Amino acid sequence: MENMYQYGTGRRKSSSARVFLKTGTGNITINNRKLNNYFSRRTARLIILQPIEFVNMSKKCDLYITVKGGGISGQVGAIRHGISRALIKYDSSFRNELRKLGFITRDSRQVERKKVGFRKARKRPQFSKR
């Protein structure tokens, strides 16, 4: 198991992330940039670290991540989903713990399409009685 990559794919909204996990010292690289440089928002970094810290692997593994599509929120969710899947491949005993927290479940919510005759997906034109 030493120096072997474990792979996980995560998706959220229109973002998709490929996560490669291997034993190491806790380095996280996203699109060839450090975690702190890629996501300046503290909440985004905390969401990404949730599954790793929950299973006490934050200083035991290195992560190499490529993510594309979407915005900050979608990319963060996709990365968290991918990390969770990679951790399960690394050690299947993490499955039940991560399942209880909802990290394994793919968030299937998507942007609703705009309808013809409406201003947005659900916003209708102003109604006039007379």
From Swiss-Prot:
One of its GO terms (biological process) is translation. GO terms for cellular component: cytosolic small ribosomal subunit. The keyword Zinc does not apply. It holds the Pfam family Ribosomal_S9. Signal peptide: none annotated. GO terms for molecular function: RNA binding; structural constituent of ribosome. It comes from the Bacteria. The keyword Ribosomal protein applies. InterPro entries: Ribosomal_Su5_D2-typ_SF, Ribosomal_uS9, Ribosomal_uS9_bac/plastid, Ribosomal_uS9_CS, Ribsml_uS5_D2-typ_fold_subgr. Keywords: Ribonucleoprotein, Ribosomal protein. HAMAP family: Ribosomal_uS9_B. Belongs to the universal ribosomal protein uS9 family. This is Small ribosomal subunit protein uS9. The gene is rpsI.
